[in-house]
Amino acid sequence: LPPVRQSRLAAPPAPQPHQRPHGVGFTPMSIVIRDVREHELDSVLALNNNAGSAILPLDSARLHAFYEKAEYFRVAERDGNLAGFLVGFGSDSDHDSCNFAWFKERYPHFFYIDRIVVASRRRGGGVGRAFYADVQSYAELRYPLLCCEVFLDHGADPALLFHGSFGFHEVGQNVMPDVDVRASMMMKELCSYPWVRETYGDNLPDLPWVGRPRRPQPRTSLATGT
């Protein structure tokens, strides 16, 4: 398992035999995945809002709410530049997404990927696979299920194939009322969780690669001089 707080991965990580198609080559590169820093939020916002129709737009207030509340909010860095980000919430989180609510109505304990965004110039270079390896290594120590959605109205085949190659399957569909977008609700069972839970309960070892959930992050206030 990769380190949680900061991991340097050869990306993309070697998939399981059923994940690598014959004849497809991979170019190794160095990617660092680490917790986001508050001063990077403007860059994260720009990445999100330039991602196209497959990702819902954000405003600064909602992004700061993610920063303050998300259990997992990490960025990928390559050559000193942000290459993407992933935001996730545990099932007990105070998160107001309608897709998160859809899962919460049906499953008592899960980890939800709210969004993953990869910079356009980095797509196809393994950043997404590096993120999913990292978020799974975090989630499987704490949750039995990993959940997300794929929008079906914007050329979904690449995203569906990507998630299928990681073992996700559709468990239903949801029409998002505010934006009238139909989403494939996808889930993956995390096979390591039962053993981890039985062996350690809530007392995971204090190891660097195990890490800890992000704590609530108060927004920094700037002095006004008044």
Where on the chain are the PLM-derived regions?
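Conserved acyl-donor/pantetheine-binding loop and adjacent beta-alpha core of acyl/acetyltransferases
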Residues: V87-R115
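A short, internal acetyl-CoA/4′-phosphopantetheine-binding micro-motif in the GNAT/acyltransferase core
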Residues: D114-R123, F151-D153
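Conserved GNAT acetyl-CoA-binding A-motif
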Residues: A139-L152
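Conserved active-site alpha-helix within GNAT-family acetyltransferase domains
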Residues: L152-G172
